[in-house]
Amino acid sequence: MQKISTIEEFEQVVRDNSRFIFLKHSTTCPISGAGYDAFSAFASSQKEVPAYYLHVQEARPLSNYIAETYNVKHESPQALFFEEGKVKWHASHWKISEDELAKQIAK
């Protein structure tokens, strides 16, 4: 799992990966902590898709860029599955789970 902080880094991830998962994580929210734990556990349990994340407090411009560019309302925590440069699926709060991530990746 790799931390991304800038728009340039994110654009490189999109160029380099046909599929990847991404998490917007708030370091001050307990629900976000639970989402981060589930996302991290899933990321470390599989090698099919690379996993990236950002800390909302440290990378607000990137978080806003993703919301605006991909037309996905910002939430935190928020997991996104990108495929071929588009958001194929996203979920927030308690809907982020290892099982749900696995289900979406398998589609």
Q: Which functions belong to the PLM regions below?
A:
Residues E48-S63:
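Thiol-based oxidoreductase modules, predominantly thioredoxin-like and allied folds used
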